[in-house]
């Protein structure tokens, strides 16, 4: 007989083997050799366990592992791997992969995956869930050295290798040495009331590139970058969502995106967007540069805002050189897109402090002044001490509210537009350009080489250009350029006004064109010189086919000194759009006409009707004439001469062609006899020539 303890162990082994047969067959996918090896190992483990186990009775519970259960069963049998479990596996066979265990087993093997072998079943674990790589704990590195913060990396940097961000970082940093910071495509965000990046020192040379700078909120100048006395290069950056916070005792601030003082800043492929400054007198929603320089290549300055000057950017006593850049959809009270020059509370330096700005291959569009009652300069404000050259660029769809839809120039020096389109801008006065000259500088507006001031709309005066001289000299020169298709109440193309001893010059040189401007309320379709001005229109220019509501379809001069070309020498087709007839001269067009014999013989003005073909009253140009006058380039009354015939024309005879002539012209007498006899339809007849009949052509 067996001992009781041994019997119990034997029964436990039988039970364990039975339960193993009922478990999911997926837990036993190993081949017979592997099964034998594992069973032999378990026999050794079972023997060891049998010697040390204090409790001779083995009972299976849900807490036992597969290893414990199998070991007890093998101890009972005291057999090789060809024992009960092996025979059971041979009998049961390999199940189909479609078979899945039903319900919840009470042994640990019930959680074993279908791909596990018996060896793996000894330590069943859930499959590991793939996880994303951990975010580097270090913020930046220099070479192979890691740093927990960007500030630590800056402290360690010697400038020989760049600092490279390893992840998005929230940290305000200060750079006071020459180095390169590569954001690595990540975002550097501010977390305190300061600029995200402060750069200062003794002219350090700093490069920041390849990433985004955002979240700056500075109660001082510069939300994104605050730069002082440094040489800085910004490359492949987005600077967005930053703010310089003015008001509440902070005073005037500037540069929501970038503030630079006494610094030279270069930007290449940088977007400065949706930055702002607050406080009623704060400037430079996107960028503020003072006493320095700014170079831009392939940049976008867009959707920035300032309550005072320079929604996109402002340069005070600084120089801009911008190429292939866009300044779009910015807002401010003065100079919504770009503001050049002093602000009212800064001392005027006079023309000795001139700054020469250059913008090439760029677009300034969709900028709008915030104050419809007082705002000026939708596209840009060009102020005291500033000269500006624009080349191969566009100023489109800007709104200047009161003055200067595209450009307002206050006491600027020279503004030169070379191959520039100024189109579809709007303002109350000077929808294209509003220029005012004071005692500080002479102002010179130059339109060159195909520049077009076209399709701008002013609700007041100066659809294309408004020229206002308070003192000194203001000049507008156009050569091979166009001021056409503009609309205003009066002076739709160019309007001039002066006060005191100021001088205004308008010089339309060869190739200048003024067509299709429309004064919709009163006078001066192309040019309206309200008072004294010097107007010169050269031969090979073209000033015609403009319209005005009350007088002067093309020109209205009230006290100006003017010289006009022979109308037949103007360029273009010289065809009047209203009747398709040839333009051959200048004609009075409403308002008044000078009459030297009027009244007491000293001369005076007589009212005169608008030009029509029937009432045309020609003006013969005189060099430097100075009479008040309203003119239109047109033609006199037109006539058609035809034969006056009596009787039937003889067979084979053709009368001379009709002639269309203007009043005062000579006509050709037909070379025909007084009468001609002949036969028509077999009947003798006589054709009598009675001369020409004049027929008035009415258009």
Predicted regions and their residues:
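Low-complexity, acidic Ser/Thr/Pro-rich repeat tracts that form intrinsically disordered stalk/linker regions
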Residues: 1-3, 26-145, 152-155, 635
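Sec-dependent N-terminal signal peptides of Gram-positive bacterial secreted proteins and lipoproteins
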Residues: 8-28
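Surface-exposed interfaces of beta-sheet-rich extracellular modules
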Residues: 135, 546, 572-621, 667-699
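Glycine-rich repeat segments that build the extracellular carbohydrate-interaction surface of secreted
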Residues: 153-170, 179-186
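Extracellular beta-strand-rich solenoid/capping regions of secreted or surface-exposed proteins
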Residues: 170-180, 188-210, 214-232, 246-263, ...
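Short glycine/acidic-rich loop motifs that flank beta-strands on beta-rich extracellular proteins
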Residues: 172-174, 190-195, 217-223, 243-250, ...
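Right-handed parallel beta-helix
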Residues: 183-186, 205-215, 231-245, 264-278, ...
């Amino acid at each position: 007989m067996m001992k009781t303890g041994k019997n119990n162990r034997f029964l436990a082994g039988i039970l364990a083997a039975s339960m193993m047969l009922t478990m999911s067959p997926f837990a036993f996918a190993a081949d017979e050799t592997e099964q034998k090896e594992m069973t032999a190992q378990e026999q050794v483990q079972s023997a060891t366990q049998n010697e040390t186990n204090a409790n001779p009775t083995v009972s299976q519970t849900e807490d036992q592992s597969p290893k414990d259960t199998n070991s007890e069963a093998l101890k009972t049998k005291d057999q090789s791997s060809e024992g009960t479990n092996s025979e059971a596996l041979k009998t049961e066979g390999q199940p189909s992969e479609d078979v899945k265990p039903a319900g919840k087993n009470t042994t640990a093997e019930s959680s074993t995956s279908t791909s596990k072998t018996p060896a793996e079943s000894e330590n069943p674990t859930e499959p590991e869930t793939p996880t994303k790589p951990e975010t580097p704990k270090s913020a930046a590195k220099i070479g192979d050295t890691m740093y927990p913060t960007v500030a630590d990396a800056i402290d360690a940097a010697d400038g020989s290798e760049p600092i490279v961000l390893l992840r998005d970082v929230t940290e305000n940093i200060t750079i006071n040495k020459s180095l390169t910071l590569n954001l690595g495509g990540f975002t550097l965000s501010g977390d305190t009331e300061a600029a995200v990046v402060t750069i200062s020192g003794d002219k350090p040379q700093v490069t920041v590139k390849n990433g985004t700078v955002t979240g700056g909120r500075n109660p001082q100048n510069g939300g994104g970058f605050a730069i002082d006395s440094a040489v800085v290069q910004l490359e492949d950056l987005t600077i967005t969502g930053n703010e310089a916070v003015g008001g509440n005792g902070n005073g005037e601030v500037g540069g929501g995106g970038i503030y630079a003082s006494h610094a030279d800043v270069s930007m290449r492929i940088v977007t400065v967007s949706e930055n702002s400054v607050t406080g009623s007198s704060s400037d430079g929603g996107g960028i503020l540069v003072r006493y320095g320089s700014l170079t831009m290549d392939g940049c976008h300055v867009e959707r920035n805002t300032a309550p005072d000057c320079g929604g996109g950017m402002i340069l005070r006593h600084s120089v801009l050189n911008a190429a292939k850049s866009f300044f779009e959809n910015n807002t401010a009270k003065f100079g919504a897109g770009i503001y050049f020059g002093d602000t009212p509370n800064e001392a005027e330096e006079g023309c000795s402090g001139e700054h020469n700005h250059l913008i090439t291959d760029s677009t300034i569009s969709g900028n709008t002044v915030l104050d419809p009652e007082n705002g000026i300069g939708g596209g840009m404000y060009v102020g005291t001490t500033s000269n500006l050259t624009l080349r191969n660029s566009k100023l489109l769809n800007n709104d200047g509210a009161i003055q200067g839809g595209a450009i307002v120039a206050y006491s600027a020096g020279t503004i030169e537009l070379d191959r520039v389109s100024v189109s579809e801008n709007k303002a109350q006065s000077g929808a294209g350009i509003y220029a005012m000259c004071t005692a500080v500088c002479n102002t010179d507006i130059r339109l060159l080489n195909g520049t077009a001031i076209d399709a701008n709309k002013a609700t007041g005066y100066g659809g294309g250009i408004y020229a206002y001289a308070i003192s000194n000299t203001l000049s507008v020169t156009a050569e091979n350029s166009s001021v056409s298709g503009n609309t205003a109440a009066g002076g739709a193309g160019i309007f001039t006004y002066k006060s005191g001893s100021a001088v205004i010059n308008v010089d339309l040189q060869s190739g200048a064109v003024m067509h299709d401007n429309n004064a919709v309320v009163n006078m001066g379709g192309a040019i309206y010189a309200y008072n004294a001005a010097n107007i010169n229109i050269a031969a090979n220019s073209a000033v015609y086919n403009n319209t005005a509501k009350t007088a002067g379809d093309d020109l209205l001069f009230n006290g100006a000194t003017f010289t006009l070309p022979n109308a037949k020498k103007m360029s273009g087709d010289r065809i009047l759009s209203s009747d398709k007839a040839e333009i051959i001269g200048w004609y009075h067009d409403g308002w008044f006409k000078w009459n030297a014999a009027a009244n007491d013989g000293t001369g005076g003005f007589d009212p005169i009707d608008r030009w029509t073909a029937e009432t045309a009253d020609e003006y013969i140009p005189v060099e430097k004439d100075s009479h008040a006058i309203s003119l239109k380039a047109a033609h006199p009354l037109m006539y058609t001469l035809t034969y006056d015939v009596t009787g039937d024309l003889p067979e084979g005879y053709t009368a001379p062609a009709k002639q269309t002539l203007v009043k005062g012209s000579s006509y050709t007498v037909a070379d025909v006899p007084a009468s001609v006899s002949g036969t028509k339809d077999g009947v003798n007849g006589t054709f009598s020539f009675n001369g020409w009949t004049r027929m008035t052509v009415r258009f």
